[in-house]
Structure formats: C-alpha cells, structure tokens
Amino acid sequence: MSDKYMKNLTFANIAKACEGTYIGDETLLDTTITGAVIDSRQVKEGYLFIPIKGERVDGHKFIPTVFEQGAAIVLSEHELTDSAGPYVLVESTTDAMKKLAAFYRKSLDIKVVGITGSVGKTSTKEMISSVLEQKYSVHKTAGNFNNEIGLPLTIFGIRESHQVAVLEMGISDFGEMHRLSTMSCPDVMVITNIGYCHLEFLGDRDGVLKAKTECFEHMMPDAVAVLNADDDKLATVQTLSLIHISEPTRLRRISY
C-alpha cells in the first residue's frame, strides 16, 4: 500500500478499534484514510478528523468545515444531524484516539524505541534517531509531542515505509506511562534518569521511579530495556517485580 494511506485504518477498523458505532454509507466501510489529525486546519483529502473538547474550544464545532476541506470521516461524541459524511459515534473522542493509536501501532511491522526519563528525553531521541537513520527509515517524535495527546498523533504519522519509530514519552502522574506504553508497545525502552520533576504528583523519586517503570507493562515480547546504571534509582532495578515483569530476566551492565 502507498504511503499516502494509513495501513489497515479502514472505516470499519476505525469503528472497531475505537469501540464505536459507524454511521454512514456502508459501501464506504473498506475505505482507508490518508491521515488523522485533531486540528481542523490540518485536514486534507481523505483524513480522519478527531474533534477534542478543550478548555476553551470544542473541536466538534469544526466538523461541518472539515468535510468541506476533504475529510473522509470524523469521530463524534454525539449524533450528527444531516452530516455531510460518515462518522463514528464514541463515548470519548480522546479515549477513542488512544485506542485507535494502539490498534494502528500493532498493525504495523515496525520496531519502536520508547524513550522516557526526567531529563534528556529529547536529546536522547535525537541521538538515537540520528544513528538509526544511517541504515533505516525512521519516524520520530516531532518537538515534544510526548503526552497522551501528542503520542497518538506521532503514531498516526508512521507509514508502511518506516522501519523504526523513536517515540518520546513524558508524564507527570501515575497511570500516564501505563496509557502511553499501551499505545506505543515498545520493542526497546530507554529510561535516561530518575529526577525531581512532578513531585507534586509523584511524591518523591521513588514515586518517579514507580511511575516511569510503568512503561514496561506493555512492551513487546522479547523487548529490551536500556537503563542508566549511573542513576542511583535505576541502579536498584534488579528484580522484575520493580519493572512489572513476572518471569526471570537477564541483566547486563555495559560500561564505556
């Protein structure tokens, strides 16, 4: 399939992945979208538009406009009267977007490198990407699109020609890394360090360690974890109970 299209994201699969109800012309169910965005200004021909309710603006108000711009299908939290195109009715567009990102990632034959840590995530992402680009077609997080909104949008940017995705993941509270790793399912997970960020939610560095290591819950089979052994907290991760894995592991210390 051409990189113009998002592999396996047909209207039917979008509805299934989002656990929503497809409403529209059923002859279009096998139509594959060409992109997915939350910003109505970025909509192009064949795109999926995902309206998000923000603090000041509800993206649903732009649904009529995006169909005029060429959107193929939209998500919606409420039924649309006289819709100009097909849509998938869901309880929460934000949650549906995350489910769709997880489905899309798993449908792709690609290796994913996940990167987290209190500091150094972006620099590490750029260095790893630079090395991998010498041999592979790499898709990487743009800017700091590393949260529960930015990560799915980054995943939606992956195309079939990409061989590796380098995804930055940032959190501020417990449970967030669990949700991010559910979407990204890393084959390699890098933790740069455990610092003092977001202690108002995580309590102390032990809390930061616990929150960051949620990333191991949804790694792919035979995945590899790369931890900074010079970090005193990460150096304590020597039993799998700390990294949410139930079977024995092999730990190897690499120095240079």
Show where each model-derived region lies.
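N-terminal leader/targeting and accessory segments in enzymes
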Residues: 1-99
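Phosphate-binding loop of NTP-binding sites
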Residues: 15-16, 96-229, 233-241
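Structural signal for conserved beta-strand scaffold positions within catalytic alpha/beta enzyme cores
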Residues: 24, 51, 76, 89-90, ...
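Structural alpha-beta junctions
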Residues: 71, 241-242
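Generic alpha-helical hydrophobic packing signal
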Residues: 73-79, 86-88, 213, 224, ...
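Residue immediately C-terminal to the conserved phosphorylatable aspartate in receiver
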Residues: 78, 169, 249
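Active-site loop signature of alpha/beta-hydrolase-fold enzymes
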Residues: 81, 197, 251
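Single conserved hydrophobic/aromatic residue that forms the stacking wall/gate
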Residues: 243-256
